[in-house]
């Protein structure tokens, strides 16, 4: 096997030279963002003989390994005597001398790598290195150190780094060799392909090999997890730099991907895979700040991590939550940082959307570097539209401000008091003379920018130097403000900034109307992406809103692999569940439900348009000899799992689950066989008319697209299709669905019906429902 390795300077020196503790008082998202800004400011102040963000790359052969080392130097200065100097800029909230002394080997190592690359490019015998330190919040405070090296000194230094890195990386080379051998021998893990499965697999293989974006509607039963992962893995053979990101919004999606890989491993595949778990779920020290004074797992993290990675990769290939926490606990290291570092040496990374698409929490280690080898599988892609909008939107709450101010009312910190006073004045100025309601701001106010910036700088200083002043309420508010401030950089024609004025409060809301261009930008960074779901109709709408190109990106809509007659769709158009009519429908809908469940003992879901409607329905429905379980607001994951345990196979009594359409039980639920035999869907799933959706509709209207469809109709019908999809989960399942609303007979809604719904039957009374289903279940 030819051994090749592409490394960024950051990857090399961070792995080998970083030491000490995790400390979010010094290294955090806010300080990184401010650091980027100060980098740009400082670079712009230099003269014409200063080159900023200079790209460097060189190929080396070390111990039989072909290594490409690359990166961007912060600056290159040509001095008057013709000599060159590499400028490495570091900014920090910490005192400069302490920061420099704690991190010198790491910083000078990075600069020396850039210096060597530039010396090779320009054929220089010697070169200078400058370390420029700038204090955040006190930009005039700088520390500049100059060093000079011969090319031979730099060569010895960099080659020594290579040798140290390869001593560790030989584990990975051995793994890659085994992985490639087993991928070559790997065959599809099932005896035969299901209907549509081979077609989906071929498309995915082509995307993984050739690049591009692909959109696929793959209904339940096709086996879309295996049909996407298997060809991606097959296509990645002999490309040691490819990482496959399996992105999903739900725990069930992670479990499906994990189980698919385990099945392939059982057939001989050797592959490193990891499931990334959210920080709040994996943390050992909940409530602690991420610094060595509060969390023992932060202390000495960077001194330990090389050894822990070496042990982990020698002994494991599957890294799930249990394995990660076990290793981290044993070695007393932070499990969250550990799983992120470990992912660098894994082939498949199973994680939430935000690790790729969120502008604040995306994995910079992958997407701030060259990502052109990587592949993405976006599961349940219909969810990414709203999720991405949320990622690029933010809110500052006046109530959160009041809570923060109250929590530090006894503080004597002068600058904090001043920052809070400025915020109070800002809220007063913005809302002066405004009635309750939503008020759009035409421009982003200068005062808003300056006051938020002052507050952030103040909190950064407190967080580092007077941490005892940072109450939970102040920290929570600071994080909200910091997120809002960062996202303000995106403010433009795809945004509105508005005030939501309430009777006793106000929210400042930065709303992203359309995040498709941001999704597209991320997808352009990587080699290939497949975005798939059981519900991607109308397909043009999803390609539009998920950053695709309707004219050029391939798409496919696969038919259901299940017998069409196994699902009975009934439409009850005599009932109007529109907002103005709802109060008159509870008893009538209750009668439809009673007759729907009358013929067959079993498990049924009843989907209501809202919690309020569900409560009134339960008050008005008269049910006997049935067990009833009701979804509650804000159910935790373990509560949802317990809820579903009430719907077991071979029930002796009828069990009803009352829930809200579009909620946790509308998708990602897999109740096979007779664990679920029917669903009643009340209404069309459309969100209630609201200010933000109206603005989204207006945005698309202004671009000559059907705004109401984009903001209301399509998302609503998607929730309905997802809910219907809970009923038939295998080839042997039989079940029925009752759609209650007059609008289901309207053409604009019927145009969105799936192909297997086209044989739906209209029922004009509860008795007709009972009669129809008696024949269906009898047959």
Can you say where each PLM-predicted feature lies in the sequence?
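Conserved RecA-like P-loop NTPase helicase motor core
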Residues: 573-584, 632-745
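Signature of the SF2 helicase/ATPase Hel1-core->accessory helical subdomain module
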Residues: 228, 255, 331-348, 353-456, ...
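Conserved pre-motif I regulatory segment
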Residues: 175-217, 230
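A contiguous, basic/glycine-rich beta-loop/short-helix subdomain that forms a polymer-engagement track
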Residues: 324-349, 360-367, 461-576, 584-585, ...
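Mg2+/Mn2+-dependent nuclease catalytic core
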Residues: 58-156
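Metal-dependent nuclease catalytic cores that hydrolyze phosphodiester bonds in DNA/RNA
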Residues: 1-79
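Conserved interdomain hinge at the start of the Helicase C-terminal
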Residues: 521, 573-609
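A substrate-engagement module of RecA-like helicase motors
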Residues: 181, 187, 241-349, 357, ...
């Amino acid at each position: 096997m030819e051994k090749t390795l592409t490394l960024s300077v950051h990857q090399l020196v961070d792995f080998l030279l970083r030491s000490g503790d995790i400390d979010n008082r010094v290294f955090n998202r806010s300080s990184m963002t401010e650091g980027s800004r100060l980098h740009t400011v400082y670079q712009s102040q230099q003269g014409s003989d200063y080159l900023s963000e200079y790209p460097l790359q060189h190929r080396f052969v070390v111990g039989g390994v072909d290594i490409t080392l690359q990166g961007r130097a912060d600056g290159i200065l040509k001095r008057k005597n013709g000599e060159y100097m590499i400028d490495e800029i570091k900014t920090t909230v910490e005192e400069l001398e302490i920061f420099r002394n704690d991190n010198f080997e790491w910083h000078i190592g990075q600069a020396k790598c850039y210096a060597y690359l530039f010396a090779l490019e320009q054929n220089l015998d010697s070169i200078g290195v400058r370390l420029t330190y700038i204090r955040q919040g006190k930009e005039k405070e700088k520390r500049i150190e100059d060093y000079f090296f011969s090319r031979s000194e730099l060569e010895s230094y960099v080659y020594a780094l290579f040798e140290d890195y390869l001593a560790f990386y030989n584990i990975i080379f051995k793994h890659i060799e085994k992985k490639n051998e087993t991928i070559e021998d790997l065959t599809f893990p099932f005896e035969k392909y299901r209907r549509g499965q081979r077609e989906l697999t071929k498309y995915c293989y082509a995307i993984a090999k050739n690049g591009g974006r692909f959109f696929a509607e793959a209904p339940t039963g096709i086996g879309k997890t295996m049909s996407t992962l298997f060809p991606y893995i097959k296509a990645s053979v002999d490309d040691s730099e490819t990482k496959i990101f399996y992105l999903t919004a739900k725990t069930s999606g992670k479990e499906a991907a994990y189980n698919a890989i385990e099945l392939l491993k059982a057939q001989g595949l050797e592959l490193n895979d990891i499931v990334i778990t959210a920080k709040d779920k994996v943390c050992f020290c909940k409530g602690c700040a991420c610094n060595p004074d509060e969390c023992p797992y932060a202390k000495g993290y960077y001194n330990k991590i090389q050894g822990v990675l070496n042990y982990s990769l020698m002994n494991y290939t599957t890294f799930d939550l249990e394995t990660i926490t076990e290793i981290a606990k044993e070695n007393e290291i932070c499990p969250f940082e550990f799983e992120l570092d470990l992912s660098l040496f894994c082939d498949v990374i199973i994680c939430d959307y935000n690790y790729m698409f969120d502008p604040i929490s995306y994995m910079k280690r992958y997407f701030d570097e060259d990502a052109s080898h990587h592949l993405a599988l976006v599961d349940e892609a219909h969810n990414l539209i709203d999720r991405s909008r949320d990622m690029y939107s933010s809110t500052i709450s006046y109530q959160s401000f009041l809570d923060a101010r109250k929590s530090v009312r006894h503080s004597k910190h002068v600058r904090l008091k001043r920052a809070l006073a400025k915020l109070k004045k800002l809220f007063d100025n913005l809302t002066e003379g405004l009635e309750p309601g939503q008020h759009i701001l035409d421009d982003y106010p200068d005062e808003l920018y300056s006051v938020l910036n002052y507050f952030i700088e103040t909190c950064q200083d407190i967080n580092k130097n007077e941490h005892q002043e940072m109450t939970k309420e102040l920290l929570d508010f600071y994080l909200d403000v910091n997120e809002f401030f960062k996202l303000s950089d995106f403010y433009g024609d795809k945004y509105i900034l508005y005030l939501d004025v309430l009777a006793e409060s106000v929210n400042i809301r930065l709303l992203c109307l359309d995040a498709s261009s941001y999704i597209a930008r991320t997808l352009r960074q990587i080699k290939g992406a497949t975005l798939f779901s059981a519900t991607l109709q109308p397909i043009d709408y999803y390609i539009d809103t998920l950053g695709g190109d309707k004219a050029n990106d391939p798409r496919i809509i696969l038919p259901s692999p299940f017998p069409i007659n196994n699902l009975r769709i009934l439409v009850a158009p005599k009932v109007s569940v529109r907002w103005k009519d709802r109060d008159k429908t509870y008893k009538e809908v209750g009668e439809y439900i009673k007759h729907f469940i009358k013929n067959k003992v079993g498990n049924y879901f009843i989907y209501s348009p809202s919690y309020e409607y569900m409560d009134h329905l339960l008050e008005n429905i008269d049910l006997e000899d049935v067990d009833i379980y009701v979804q509650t607001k804000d159910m935790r994951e373990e509560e949802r799992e317990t809820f579903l345990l009430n719907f077991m196979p071979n029930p002796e009594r009828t069990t009803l689950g009352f829930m809200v359409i579009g909620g946790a039980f509308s998708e990602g639920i897999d109740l096979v066989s007779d664990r679920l035999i029917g669903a009643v869907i009340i209404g069309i799933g459309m969100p209630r008319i609201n200010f933000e959706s109206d603005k989204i509709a207006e945005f698309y209207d202004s671009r000559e697209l059907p705004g109401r469809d984009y903001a209301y109709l399509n998302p609503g019908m998607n929730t309905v299709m997802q809910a219907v999809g809970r009923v038939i989960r295998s080839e042997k399942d039989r079940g029925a669905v009752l759609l209650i609303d007059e609008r289901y007979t309207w053409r604009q809604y019927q145009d969105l019906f799936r192909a297997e719904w086209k044989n739906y039957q209209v029922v004009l009374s509860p008795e007709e429902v009972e009669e129809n289903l008696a024949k269906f279940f009898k047959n």
